[in-house]
Amino acid sequence: MRTYILLLFTLFTLETAAQSFNDLCRKGIENIKDYEFQKAIANFEKAEVASTSKHEKIYCLVNIAYSRQMLGDLHGALKSYNKALDINNKELTLIQQRANIYLQLDSVEKALADYNTILKEEESNTGALLCRAHIYTNIGKYKEAWNDYAMLERWLPDNISVQLGIAVLYQKEKKYTECMEMLDNLIKKNPDIPELYLARSNVEREQGYNELALMDINKAIELDPQNASNYLLQAIIYDKMGKKSAAKKSREKARLLGKDSNLLNF
């Protein structure tokens, strides 16, 4: 009789734990749908404690990482992804998510190491390849960047992000004619994408064509008026043109949108 009672108690405990896990996860998902990320973290942390398998624990940690990322807590998100990878360090999706966080935190070498790991296993992972090409461009490994973009053009011949990346690579190499030809063509085909005007403005500013740069940054602001960084770039152009009052107004607009002018270095 005692053995039978213990068996019933064990089964009841397992069933209750399973239901608790499922209920907590369901609540967490609803929290995410409602943009209640702090509540989502709390529910998934409880679900992690109630989890009974590695798969369940990873599921909780990924949702915690996502919620922290949405709250702007990149270091917290990184911590959760690392915990998940401690459980399964072969999961490429987790490695890619971690690499993306590293990239946002400017931990370039760590991001590059993760993207290399992914691409050794999945040569055709275009997301990882594009990010690696971006890193190579920024750290001055132009030959490696061209190799990555050559593969990306083969797999994604009309992708705007790929074409924009190539234009930036031309800019880094001071090949302004090729760069401007690409950007002009991209803008002609996609006149409503603010990032393209921003990119062309940067090239024009770099060459000293401040009036053209101002026209393009103004267009980028027109298309995306809530992007605070564009107002800071506008202020820099105004400064170069000697328009101090206009520059001050642009910086104030950026500040009101939540961007500290001291955070960016152009």
Residue ranges and their predicted role:
Residues 46-52, 83-86, 117-120, 150-154, ...:
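Conserved structural position within tetratricopeptide repeats
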Residues 33-34, 67-70, 104-105, 138-139, ...:
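Register position in tetratricopeptide repeats
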Residues 16-63, 70, 266:
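N-terminal leader/linker segments that initiate helical-solenoid repeat arrays
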Residues 59-63, 70, 97, 131, ...:
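Canonical tetratricopeptide repeat
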Residues 21-22, 54-58, 92-93, 126-127, ...:
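Helix-start (N-cap) detector for alpha-helical repeat units in TPR-like alpha-solenoids
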Residues 232-266:
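Terminal, low-structured helical/coil segments at or just beyond the last alpha-helical repeat
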